[in-house]
């Protein structure tokens, strides 16, 4: 049964829905994360594939979101890391990321999540969806990106499986954002389907907040 929020004192909750690569894949990504001076590299706690950024909502809407995602039914996804690239902002490199393939199964899951969120009043996603894992955030003081892209252009991992979806709360701080898992939603297995009802994390688990700063 979906548990309510744990009662943190925040009046609003900054939420997003994501897939978390398994530890061996995260380790491989971290090993490649170097070579751009001034980059804000992600740490292990921050590596994820965002399915849907929700943004700031009040407590009641947050509880509605957590409950709505309990209706998610979707298959597990076999995926792999395939190459690196970047996003630009105002003509400057803004973010370095690793691609995830095949894209369509992840995009299909993104659409299902979006449909469930619309049922509880979250606006439909209008931005194009590109499955990726953010590796670093850049600013005007960051060094050249081209050497990193050239070195890691063929970055690849063995196939792995996304077995569940997680609802996260993002807490902004002076050192950057910290991501707290709120509820986990298993995806259906490839043979015997498992229940997609949410398994909310206990208050104790949530209170053991990871130390992370993007």
Which residues fall in each region the model found?
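Histidine-dependent nucleotide/RNA phosphoesterase domain, centered on the 2H-phosphoesterase fold
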Residues: 2-204, 214
């Amino acid at each position: 049964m979906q548990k309510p929020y744990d009662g943190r004192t925040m009046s609003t909750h900054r939420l997003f829905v994501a897939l978390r690569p398994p530890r061996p894949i995260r380790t491989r990504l971290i090993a490649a994360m170097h070579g751009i001076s001034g980059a804000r590299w992600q740490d292990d706690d921050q590596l994820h594939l965002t399915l849907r950024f929700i943004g700031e909502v009040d407590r009641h809407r947050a509880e509605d979101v957590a409950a709505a995602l309990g209706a998610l039914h979707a298959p597990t996804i076999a995926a792999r890391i395939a190459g690196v690239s970047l996003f630009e902002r105002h003509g400057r490199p803004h973010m370095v990321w690793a691609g995830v393939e095949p894209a369509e199964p992840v995009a299909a899951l993104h659409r299902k999540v979006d449909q469930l969120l619309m049922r509880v009043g979250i606006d439909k996603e209008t931005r194009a969806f590109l499955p990726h894992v953010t590796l670093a955030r850049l600013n005007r003081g960051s060094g050249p990106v081209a050497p990193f892209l050239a070195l890691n252009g063929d970055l690849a991992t063995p196939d792995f499986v996304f077995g569940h979806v997680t609802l996260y709360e993002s807490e902004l701080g002076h050192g950057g954002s910290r991501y707290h898992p709120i509820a986990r939603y298993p995806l259906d297995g490839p043979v015997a389907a498992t229940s997609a009802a949410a398994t909310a994390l206990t208050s104790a688990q949530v209170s053991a907040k990871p130390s992370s700063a993007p």
